[in-house]
Amino acid sequence: MKVTIVGAGNVGATCADVISYRGIASEVVLLDIKEGFAEGKALDITQCATNTGFNTKVSGVTNDYSKTAGSDVVVITSGIPRKPGMTREELIGINAGIVKTVAENVLKYSPNTIIVVVSNPMDTMTYLALKATGLPKNRIIGMGGALDSSRFRTYLSLALDKPANDISAMVIGGHGDTTMIPLTRLASYNGIPVSQFLSEDVLQKVAADTMVGGATLTGLLGTSAWYAPGASVAYLVDSILNDQKKMIACSVFVEGEYGQNDICIGVPCIIGKNGVEEIVNINLNDQEKALFAKSADAVRGMNDALKSILV
């Protein structure tokens, strides 16, 4: 199985590293516009093989999309990173043209591929990729919810002092500081609601920390995070290539689900060999429904900035 990652920056390279190390794909191609950059990252990752024991073929290319031919999954990380103080909305004008061009180029050589969008603002870039390519909605997936849910589980783990892998929790809604919705009511530790262990005040603090998780790291690092985002992409790609049918929160195109239409937004999905196999309907309470509707309105508002690009 072959995976192409467009954009060999921190997130793209980390994704390639995790996919290779875990043997998720037999071949990974890193592509970047900067001369020699993807080649260098690929060579560095390849030189880990003897110490970490993987056999994945990793190669890098400079803007040569012919080398990506036959990719089962294409991951788009291209775009400028989020800078301190920069909103996701401000990224739209810069990144939209990049994502559109990349999506069109990869489809020339991999017409049957599934595209995973990582570029920010992620929900809007996912919507752009869908509309610009005309692909079936199951083949365009935004990664955001997988990362947000991972951060939510991590903060719950810290609050509980229990292993994160024993915690089930999900974030839906837009992939933004004010639009994501950590579902504290449904979070559990080994099947037991976390509300039995944590007070409402602590749960609200966990939710708040989750919502600003990306911004917190941007402030600390001076740029966007990359380890957790890269690992989250690899987790999603694994479920696609190996038809694992995991339920993962992803930004996908909705047509009536959760009362919304004509946007890409984070909802629980079954992810398998066909991409989005199913959108899972969770019975939200009235407060959660209101938050989701508000989140959808915010995402829809950002999409308005795409009108001049999609004409």
Curated annotation (Swiss-Prot):
InterPro entries on file: L-lactate/malate_DH (IPR001557), Lactate/malate_DH_C (IPR022383), Lactate/malate_DH_N (IPR001236), Lactate_DH/Glyco_Ohase_4_C (IPR015955), Malate_DH_type3 (IPR011275), NAD(P)-bd_dom_sf (IPR036291)
Superkingdom, natural source: Bacteria
Active site: 175 (proton acceptor)
Keyword field contains Oxidoreductase: yes
Record GO terms (molecular function): L-lactate dehydrogenase activity; L-malate dehydrogenase (NAD+) activity
Native organism: Flavobacterium johnsoniae (strain ATCC 17061 / DSM 2064 / JCM 8514 / BCRC 14874 / CCUG 350202 / NBRC 14942 / NCIMB 11054 / UW101)
Lineage: Bacteria, Pseudomonadati, Bacteroidota, Flavobacteriia, Flavobacteriales
One record GO biological process: lactate metabolic process
Keyword tags: NAD, Oxidoreductase, Tricarboxylic acid cycle
Record-given protein name: Malate dehydrogenase
